[in-house]
Swiss-Prot record:
Residues 272-291, 374-394, 436-455 are annotated as: Disordered. The keyword Glycoprotein does not apply. It is a multi-pass membrane protein. This is Mitochondrial distribution and morphology protein 10.
Length: 471
C-alpha cells in the first residue's frame, strides 16, 4: 500500500497533468505491482493529514526489534483541493496498486504559460479573464517539497525537490543524508540524485546524475503509432500500444557500466469495449476494421534484456475480470543457466450493503396492521447516501505470490471503519527479504525446523500489520 506522502505526490502529478507511466522505469510496473509487493514488518502505525490544500504531514511509529519511526512534511505550490485525504474516502485502488491499465499516450498540456526555469518566481502580475476582470497569474511554477526524518539514530534524512520547468519537462532532486554513530566525528554521509525528465507523449527521455560514484544515466521510451501532438480529424480509437525503451549508466569513478532494453505490448481500454450498436452505417464500416475488440481481457506483455549480465525476463499480466488479475514472470540467465519463475494474483472484494427499504414503506406499516388502521400514503424516507461510496469504503484486496522455491507471500489490504489496514505473512524455505528482524527471529529459533521447513531454517518468516489513518 502506498504511503500517504506517495499518494500526495501522485495527486500532484495528476494535478499538473504529468504522466508518470510514460517512462521506461514504469515499463514493468503492472507485473511488479502483482508480483513484487512487500508485506508489513511487525506492527506499524501511520498518522497523516492534509492540513491545507498546500501542506501535508505524516508520522510513523513502528516496532521492528526496536521502536522506530519517521516524521514527514510536504508542501505543494499547486492546491490539492480535489484530493480526498481522509482514510475513509481515499479510493483503495489508488493506494493498493494492482493491475495497471495502460492508457493511450496524450500530448502535454500547453496552456500553463511557463517560459523558463526561474520565470515568474516573484511576479504578481494579473492577466485578464474572459469577463474582463483580472485574475492573478501563476506566480510560481508547480513545485513540491518533501522531507522525511527517520528516527532513532542512525538518523536518516530524505528530501525531495520536484519542479515543473515547462509543460514537457520536470526536474527532480533527491537527497539522502545519514548521520554516523554517536561517537563518530565523521561528517554525515550524503548523496544527491538529480533527474531531468522530458515527456512529449510520443517519447520520453530521462537524464540522471548521482553524486554516489559520479554516476551518469539515461532512460528513454518510445511509443509506436501516431503522434498525440498531431491528432487527426476523425481518429479511430487505438486498440493496443507497443513501446520500446532502454537505459544506460556509466560511472567514471568506479568504471561501472550498465544497460538494459525492453519492449511492452499492452491492450488499451478500447480493445475490450464493444462498438456502439447505435452507430451509423458509415461509422460501422469504419469500426469494422478498427473498433472490433481484439481481446476479451486486458493484458500486458513485457520483455526486458540486460546484455552485460545475460539476463532475460518476460512477464505476462492479465485482468480476467474487474476484480481478478493474474501475472507471471520468467527469468533466465544465459551465462549461469539459472532461471526464475514467479506467479501471482490479486482478488478484490466488495461487501455490499443491504438494500434500502421500499420507498412506500416508512417503517411504521407493522404498527398500522396491528391497529387495523387504513393505509395512508407513506412518507418517503430520506434517500440513503450513494452506494458507490459505500462500496469503495468496504473494498479489500487479497494478493498472493509464489515462486519456484515455494516461497509464498500473502497480503490483505482493506478498510476497517475509517482505518486502512495491511496484513501480510511470508512462508517458505527461504526468506523474501534480508531484514534484520527476520534474520534474528530465525537465529532465535535455536535451529529447529518449524512447519516442515528445512532443518536449521524457519518456514514461518514473519507476519506484520500496518494501520493507517489520515484526515
Amino acid at each position: 500500500m502506498l504511503d500517504f506522502m506517495d499518494y500526495i505526490q501522485l495527486a500532484f502529478a495528476e494535478a499538473t497533468n504529468w504522466n508518470r507511466d510514460n517512462s521506461y522505469s514504469f515499463l514493468t510496473a503492472t507485473a511488479q505491482s502483482l508480483l513484487d509487493f512487500s508485506t508489513p514488518e511487525r506492527l506499524r502505525v501511520h498518522l497523516s493529514s492534509l492540513a491545507t490544500p498546500h501542506f501535508a504531514t505524516s508520522y510513523t511509529l513502528g516496532t521492528v526489534g526496536l521502536i522506530d519511526g519517521s516524521v514527514s512534511y510536504l508542501y505543494s505550490t499547486v492546491p490539492l483541493n480535489n484530493t480526498p485525504s481522509r482514510s475513509a474516502l481515499i479510493p483503495l485502488r489508488k493506494l493498493a496498486r494492482g493491475y495497471r491499465q495502460v492508457q493511450p499516450p496524450v500530448a502535454p498540456v500547453e496552456d500553463w504559460g511557463w517560459q523558463s526555469l526561474l520565470g515568474g518566481l516573484g511576479s504578481s502580475e494579473s492577466k485578464p479573464s474572459g469577463n474582463g476582470d483580472s485574475q492573478p497569474s501563476l506566480g510560481r511554477k508547480a513545485t513540491l517539497l518533501n522531507a522525511t526524518l527517520h528516527l532513532p539514530p542512525p538518523t536518516t534524512l530524505n528530501a525531495l525537490f520536484l519542479r515543473r520547468i515547462s509543460p514537457t519537462m520536470q526536474l527532480s532532486l533527491a537527497v539522502c543524508s545519514t548521520r554516523g554513530a554517536p561517537l563518530s566525528n565523521s561528517a554525515p554521509q550524503a548523496s544527491l540524485l538529480g533527474q531531468l525528465s522530458h515527456d512529449t507523449g510520443k517519447y520520453s527521455n530521462e537524464y540522471l546524475f548521482s553524486t554516489d560514484n559520479s554516476l551518469f544515466g539515461w532512460r528513454g521510451l518510445w511509443n509506436f503509432g501516431p503522434d498525440p501532438r498531431h491528432p487527426k480529424e476523425n481518429p479511430s480509437p487505438r486498440l493496443s500500444l507497443l513501446s520500446a525503451g532502454a537505459e544506460a549508466y556509466y560511472s567514471p569513478v568506479s568504471s561501472l557500466i550498465g544497460m538494459s532494453t525492453g519492449l511492452r505490448f499492452s491492450t488499451l481500454p478500447a480493445a475490450t469495449e464493444m462498438p456502439s450498436s447505435s452507430s451509423s452505417t458509415s461509422s460501422t464500416t469504419t469500426t469494422s476494421n478498427h473498433g472490433t475488440p481484439i481481446s476479451t481481457f486486458p493484458y500486458t506483455l513485457t520483455l526486458v534484456l540486460t546484455p552485460l549480465t545475460g539476463s532475460l525476463s518476460t512477464t505476462y499480466s492479465l485482468r480476467a475480470s474487474p476484480n481478478l488479475a493474474f501475472s507471471s514472470r520468467f527469468g533466465f540467465n544465459v551465462y549461469s543457466w539459472e532461471s526464475e519463475m514467479v506467479a501471482g494474483c490479486e482478488l478484490w472484494r466488495k461487501r455490499r450493503k443491504s438494500s434500502p427499504p421500499p420507498v412506500d414503506d416508512d417503517g411504521l406499516e407493522w404498527a398500522r396492521r396491528k391497529m387495523r388502521m387504513a393505509d395512508t400514503p407513506g412518507v418517503p424516507p430520506v434517500e440513503p447516501p450513494s452506494t458507490h461510496n459505500r462500496d469503495e469504503e468496504n473494498e479489500s484486496v487479497l494478493k498472493i505470490r509464489v515462486d519456484q522455491s515455494w516461497n509464498v507471500r500473502l497480503l490483505w489490504e482493506g478498510r476497517v471503519k475509517e482505518l486502512l489496514v495491511s496484513a501480510g505473512v511470508g512462508l517458505g524455505p527461504s526468506s523474501f527479504s534480508s531484514s534484520s528482524w527476520a534474520a534474528n527471529s530465525t537465529a532465535a529459533g535455536g535451529g529447529q525446523s518449524v512447519g516442515g521447513g528445512v532443518s536449521g531454517k524457519s518456514y514461518w518468516h514473519g507476519v506484520g500489520v500496518s494501520v493507517s489513518y489520515s484526515s
